[in-house]
C-alpha cells in the first residue's frame, strides 16, 4: 500500500492571533505618569470625537495607554469642570455631613460636590480626617470622634461660612463667593449646625465655644464615665486645640479659605507640613 504523506503547515487559529496581538500590545503600553503631550492628545481627541469606549478611544487617539488609564486620567484630572486646589469650607462641611449619613459612598457624596471626583473626596477623607483621628488616638468611626465633628468642628466650619457670606454681602463683591458653587445641601447643613437659631450665627467665638463645650461635656460623660485621667472637658479642650491651633478673626476685606488654619486645612501648625495637598495626591496617581 502506498502511503502519501502530506506536508501540512500550521496556521494559527484566531484565538492564538488575538493572544499574540494582546501580548505585543501589552508590551508596547506605557506605564507611569502621564506626559503633557499625552494629556493634550487625549484632550484634543475627546474634544473632536467625544467620549466613547475607552479601549477603542485609546487606540484611535494613538495613545499607548490602557482604556482604563485614559478613562481615569480624563475623569479625575483633565475634564474641564474638575476643580483644582484645596476643598473650600463649604465643601469640607458637606463632606463631613454626607459621610455621617452615607459612610464611604464616595460616588454618591461626589454628586453633591460639582467638579469634585469620588476619588478626590476619598483621598481627602483618608489623608485629612483619618489622620487627624489617629492624632487624637481614636478611631475615625468611634462615637468619640463623631461627637467631636458634630458638636465642635462642624459648627465652627458653619460659623466661618456665615462670616464670609456676611462679609461678601457687606462688600457687594460676589466674585469669591463659593456658596453658589455647592449643592443646596450645604446651607441645610449650616442651618442644622445652628439649630435654626439666629443668635448662634451672630454670637462671638467664645460664646459659641461655651455652648459647644456644654454639649460635648454631656456627650463625653456618657462615653468616658468617671475617668480621672481624661474627663470630657479635658478631652474637649485637647481636640479643640488641635482643631483651631490659632484663633482666627473674620476679615471683611479678605476672608479666604486658607485662613482656616486648624483641623480643616491642616489640623495644626505642627502637622500641616506632613499632610498631602490635592496636587501631591494627583502626582501620586
From Swiss-Prot:
Gene3D superfamilies: Homeodomain-like (1.10.10.60). Keywords: DNA-binding, Nucleus, Plant defense, Repeat, Transcription, Transcription regulation. Residues 54-78, 106-129 bind DNA. GO terms for biological process: defense response; regulation of DNA-templated transcription. It is found in: Nucleus. It comes from the Eukaryota. It holds the Pfam family Myb_DNA-binding. Induction: Induced by jasmonate (JA), wounding and infection by the fungal pathogen Magnaporthe oryzae. GO terms for cellular component: nucleus. Its main location: nucleus. Residues 26-78, 79-133 form the HTH myb-type domain. GO terms for molecular function: DNA-binding transcription factor activity; sequence-specific DNA binding. The keyword Heme does not apply. Probable transcription factor that may be involved in the jasmonate-dependent defense responses to the rice blast fungus Magnaporthe oryzae. Does not seem to function in the salicylic acid-dependent signaling pathway. This is Transcription factor JAMYB. It comes from Oryza sativa subsp. japonica (Rice).
